[in-house]
């Protein structure tokens, strides 16, 4: 009888617990033990008033069912942990790279040619060279199959967005530019004959203006007489972006057309500071002698110094470099460059 009493108390406690957990019954999608048959967990409550044997049998069935439910619940917890581990592993796995068109190589990642790397060893990157050494080194670094141009690049302490700090001028290179310059002239009346006599390659008036509007650009310099500027003004959108618009500061608007033609044929070069305050001036070819390159370079330096803008303040020269078309830049010592005096002939 004591055993049955013990079983009865256990049965009541378990029946109460199973009654509270009815809402937590696993769904059929996760567990396979759920069925449509009546739930036996509540059955012992109906047998409380029956005989001893029937009560004991009910207790045994409830106990066995409890063990089954516990085992299934433990298995469900294990499956849930495995699912969580798989989810965490999927999150930690790095995403696979997307397949598509390869990205362009950045400029800093591009490799230089073997030729450039070899000639780059001839000069030290941060060293400032004197003018004579720099020009000699420049000729050594020019080893392409064509005749390269030689250029000077001066960084000035100016801001061209202000009118009093703009720089635009010309320089006559004593030894020429090393290339043939095709000069076109817009003139009328007797100026036409003067231009032809002075060696102009193309001479015209209204007819030449119409050709330019139609896309004719077979010339390097365009010179115009002052009386033609009213008609030339309409060509600004065509000539301006190409740097061919006649301008008094560039010496391409003048009444003395023969002199202008002669100067440009001999090597007169126009230059101007870009928006960052840098001036780019070509001063010859690599097949020039070192002496001729030196003379042209000093003429360019003198012109930049002479045409210093009125609004320039502080130190005017910030840096100076020279280079060939396909070669590395060579940094110059600015103080030595400005104070340099060519040797006098004996």
UniProtKB/Swiss-Prot annotation:
GO terms (BP aspect): translation
A Pfam entry, by short name: Ribosomal_L1
The keyword Transit peptide is assigned to this record: yes
Residues where Phosphoserine is found: 197
Transit sequence range: 1-70
Keywords for this protein: Chloroplast, Phosphoprotein, Plastid, Ribonucleoprotein, Ribosomal protein, RNA-binding, rRNA-binding, Transit peptide
UniProt modified residues of type Phosphothreonine: 177
Compartment(s): Plastid, Chloroplast
Molecular function GO labels: mRNA binding; rRNA binding; structural constituent of ribosome
Role this protein plays: This protein binds directly to 23S ribosomal RNA.
PANTHER family per the UniProt record, alphabetical: 54S RIBOSOMAL PROTEIN L1, MITOCHONDRIAL, LARGE RIBOSOMAL SUBUNIT PROTEIN UL1M
Protein name: Large ribosomal subunit protein uL1c
Lineage of the species this protein comes from: Eukaryota, Viridiplantae, Streptophyta, Embryophyta, Tracheophyta
């Amino acid at each position: 009888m004591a055993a049955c009493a013990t079983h009865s108390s256990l049965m009541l406690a378990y029946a109460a617990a199973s009654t509270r957990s009815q809402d937590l019954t696993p769904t059929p999608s996760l567990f396979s033990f759920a069925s449509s048959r009546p739930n036996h967990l509540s059955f012992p409550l109906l047998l409380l008033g029956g005989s001893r044997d029937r009560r004991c049998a009910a207790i045994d069935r409830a106990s066995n069912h409890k063990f089954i439910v516990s085992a299934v619940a433990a298995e469900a917890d294990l499956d849930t942990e495995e699912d969580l581990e798989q989810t965490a592993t999927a999150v930690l796995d790095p995403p696979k790279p997307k397949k598509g068109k390869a990205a362009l190589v950045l400029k800093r990642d591009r490799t230089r040619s073997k030729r450039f790397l070899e000639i780059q060893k001839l000069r030290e990157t941060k060293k400032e060279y004197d003018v004579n050494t720099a020009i000699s080194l420049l000729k050594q670094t020019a080893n392409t199959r064509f005749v390269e141009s030689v250029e000077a690049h001066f960084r000035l302490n100016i801001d061209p967005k202000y009118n009093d700090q703009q720089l635009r001028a010309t320089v006559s290179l004593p030894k020429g530019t090393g290339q043939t310059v095709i000069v076109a002239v817009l003139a009328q009346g007797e100026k036409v004959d003067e231009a032809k006599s002075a060696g102009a390659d193309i001479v015209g008036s209204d007819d030449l203006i119409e050709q330019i509007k139609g896309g004719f650009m077979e010339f390097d310099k365009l010179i115009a007489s002052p009386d033609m500027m009213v008609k030339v003004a309409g060509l600004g959108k065509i000539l301006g972006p190409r740097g061919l618009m006649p301008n008094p500061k560039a010496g391409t608007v003048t009444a003395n057309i023969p002199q202008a033609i002669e100067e440009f044929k001999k090597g007169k070069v126009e230059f101007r500071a870009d928006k960052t305050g840098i001036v780019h001036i070509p001063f010859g070819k690599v097949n020039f002698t070192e002496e001729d390159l030196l003379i042209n370079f000093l003429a360019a330096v003198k012109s930049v110094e002479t045409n210093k803008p009125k609004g320039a303040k502080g130190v005017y020269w910030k840096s100076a470099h020279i280079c060939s078309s396909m070669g590395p830049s060579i940094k110059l010592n600015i103080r030595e460059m400005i104070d340099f005096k060519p040797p006098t002939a004996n």
